[in-house]
């Protein structure tokens, strides 16, 4: 009963976290729900960029690849390597999921540093990178949770749940709690780093408009890429762990 109560409280905590607000927001009413409109707008822009890049990548493939084809093949090979390293030999079906996670987060993070979101005026609030909103990061983390539960159940069936009593049944509450804290750690890490990076740049630009913020912006681009890689790597690692057993 205590375990069930802990799990319920953790899920309620995730729901409450999705209501955390930083700055002003532009709200839409969709089906009786209040959503952050600026997150949907910037997410659609990121998705459009990814779809446009994908259409370019598959258009007129050459036997001898040109520069753009080489670049996209390198990105695909990189994602496959990350998936294979973390998941193992059965990584193939998970490459699209891991790749989508990595590319969406990567482009979202970079859009916050490269695109002039602030010059676009809204009735209320302001535009920012999708990953600058905790609703986005919590949603990505919950998708990862669904993915590794699905991977474990597909591979092992109901015997997947036996991992919760390994190596001893005494650890049952801790093992259950661990699965519910994984989304929290993923979402907080990504949200905190991206928000902090954008806040530092905004403060420096307001204090010293020229020259000084440029190195910080380059550092932000680097850390944004690292955060996307960390998220995708951990997502793949969780999926691999659920398929192989408790480590």
From Swiss-Prot:
It is a multi-pass membrane protein. Coiled coil: none annotated. It is found in: Plastid, Chloroplast thylakoid membrane. Keywords: ATP synthesis, CF(0), Chloroplast, Hydrogen ion transport, Ion transport, Membrane, Plastid, Thylakoid, Transmembrane, Transmembrane helix, Transport. One of its GO terms (molecular function) is proton-transporting ATP synthase activity, rotational mechanism. InterPro entries: ATP_syn_F0_a_bact/chloroplast, ATP_synth_F0_asu, ATP_synth_F0_asu_AS, F0_ATP_A_sf. The chain crosses the membrane at residues 38-58, 95-115, 134-154, 199-219, 220-240. GO terms for cellular component: chloroplast thylakoid membrane; plasma membrane; proton-transporting ATP synthase complex. F-type ATPases have 2 components, CF(1) - the catalytic core - and CF(0) - the membrane proton channel. CF(1) has five subunits: alpha(3), beta(3), gamma(1), delta(1), epsilon(1). CF(0) has four main subunits: a, b, b' and c. Key component of the proton channel; it plays a direct role in the translocation of protons across the membrane. Belongs to the ATPase A chain family. This is ATP synthase subunit a, chloroplastic. It comes from Eucalyptus globulus subsp. globulus.
